[in-house]
Amino acid sequence: MGIRPPPGERSPAAVLSFGVVNLDKPPGPSAHQVSAWIRDLVGVEKAAHAGTLDPKVTGCLPVLTGTATRIAPALLEGFKEYVAVLELHDDPPRILPDVIEAFTGEIYQKPPKKSAVARRLRTRTVYDLDVLDVDGRQVLLRIRCESGTYIRKLCHDIGRALGTNAHMGHLRRSATTPFDDTDLVTLHDLADAVAWLRDTDDTEPPDAPADALRAAVQPAERALTHLPRLTIADSAAHEVATGAPVYAPGVIDTTALPTPPADGALVACYTAGGTAVCLGRLVGDPDADAGVVVALERVLV
């Protein structure tokens, strides 16, 4: 089984078949709907979004295309960042800063009634909660939190703690590990890039349509940049492609691993050229002479 070329050497078709779109989701359609639109637009069999957004919510929604959908579990590792409008039902009291600070750190949440998960009390971590602006009864918040935090419920609970009651107004996701809103792509951007590539002729600069596509669809390796990484030999990569784990003799570079690496950590393995080969759990010493180092979870080639 062949190993795909390094990210910078792939054809447009190869990028589409193993790519990621950092989509600026518009209000209205569901996350599932925009994923289906992207699937049909780029002409792949499947596409998957990472971290759902409600129809009214806008912002950062990574969409994986083709075989890159195998990467989806890796995007559960990390944080989310939102900008939300807290709509108070009365004038903001003086205790607003103190109440906001009290909701930083570990909090308790019960999923809302319409949630797809069991409504059991659980803990989530709010890493940062900042007031960006106050305009009358509207409070603009920036929230950096653990995946799975319900922002609508957070706004409701803040309102109760303030004694004014409150609900969530507009919500926009500004980041989801490892993506943020600095390089978002709209559906129109993507459609234009795909159309340009398909309709190009000899009068066009030879690389311009492909460059436009690569600006809209990034190699899927972009979705793994937050994970610890191991570099493995090409011979080991070919063995992984057939389902074998990563053995110690096949590891050629560990400099991108944390020191000391945590047992059971999710890691990404690459060739020396930068092609993602697999995701797996670190189960052995990568500096050892023998033994299994990475137990496979997803083969990416």
Curated annotation (Swiss-Prot):
| Residue span, PUA domain | 227-301
**What domain of life does the UniProt record list for this protein's source?**
Archaea
Alphabetically, the GO molecular function entries are: pseudouridine synthase activity; RNA binding; tRNA pseudouridine(55) synthase activity
PROSITE patterns, A to Z: PUA
Catalytic activity field: uridine(55) in tRNA = pseudouridine(55) in tRNA
InterPro entries under this entry?
Dyskerin-like (IPR012960), PsdUridine_synth_cat_dom_sf (IPR020103), PsdUridine_synth_N (IPR002501), PUA-like_sf (IPR015947), PUA_sf (IPR036974), tRNA_PsdUridine_synth_B_fam (IPR004802), TruB_arch (IPR026326), TruB_C (IPR032819)
The protein's UniProt keywords, in alphabetical order, are: Isomerase, tRNA processing
Keyword tRNA processing listed? The answer is: yes
Q: Per the UniProt record, which EC number(s) apply here?
A: 5.4.99.25
**Pfam families the record matches:** TruB_C_2, TruB_N
Provide the active-site residues from the annotation: 54 (nucleophile)
- What does this protein's UniProt record list under function? Could be responsible for synthesis of pseudouridine from uracil-55 in the psi GC loop of transfer RNAs.
The record's section on HAMAP family has: TruB_arch (MF_01081)
- The protein in question is named Probable tRNA pseudouridine synthase B
Classification from the root reads: Archaea, Methanobacteriati, Methanobacteriota, Stenosarchaea group, Halobacteria
